[in-house]
Amino acid sequence: GQWNVDGLWQPQVDGEKISCFYGMFERSDGAKFLENYELGSNATLFSPQGGLRASASDLASILRLLANEGALNGRKILKRSSVETLLSPAWSLNAAGNNGRTSGEAQPGGARDGLMTSYGLSVHRIDMRAWGFVDGPATLLGHVGRAYGVFSFALFDPDSRDGIAMIVTGVADDPFKAPGHSPLTRLEETVLHWWINH
């Protein structure tokens, strides 16, 4: 239907029409994926990208682990070299911009272009100035998550080791129709601006 910023919540996956993301096209046979599904057999079909189900507290623990070079609550869990490998760039967009797609899984040429310009081992390496953030850290490391009406991120400043974990549900049907100054939604930008300024 028509986007209405003040409108009611619109079901995306738990309504009568299931609309899971299986590529950059709308499927008319979305319910077909459920035909052979047995409860409890494999939740992958219903899991977020990457399969991580975590609370904001869990995400904050992961950030503390990475920011503290593999230690959490006084216990060494990962070697420092392992954390360095995770956070180091495995890929970066070249100056010509022709060695990858920066929109992630979104349609190229849209508001999400520039989302990924440097990537570690499943870690976004974000140039905050390129995203239009004039204040705060120049770089953030972490991950942005989306699944079934959930918007989330877990990001930290590698210099100060300060971080933020955010999980928001119940957003309106299409928050991408009013893009901000970055590849994020305005909701995500607003939370980051709040964090930077507090």
Predicted feature locations:
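Active-site beta-strand/loop architecture of penicillin-binding DD-peptidases
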Residues: P137, G149-S152
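Short, well-ordered beta-strand elements
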Residues: H143, F151-D157, R161-P175
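Short, surface-exposed loop or secondary-structure junction motifs
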Residues: G1-L140
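C-terminal accessory segments of extracellular proteins
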Residues: H181-N197
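Short intrinsically disordered coil segments
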Residues: P137-V144, S182
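Extracellular/periplasmic catalytic domains that process cell-envelope and extracellular macromolecules
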Residues: A54, G114-T117, A147-Y148, F156-S160
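Short, well-ordered loop/turn and helix-capping segments at boundaries between secondary-structure elements
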Residues: N68, L72, S92, T169-D173, ...
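A short acidic/glycine-rich loop-to-helix N-cap element
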Residues: G170-R186
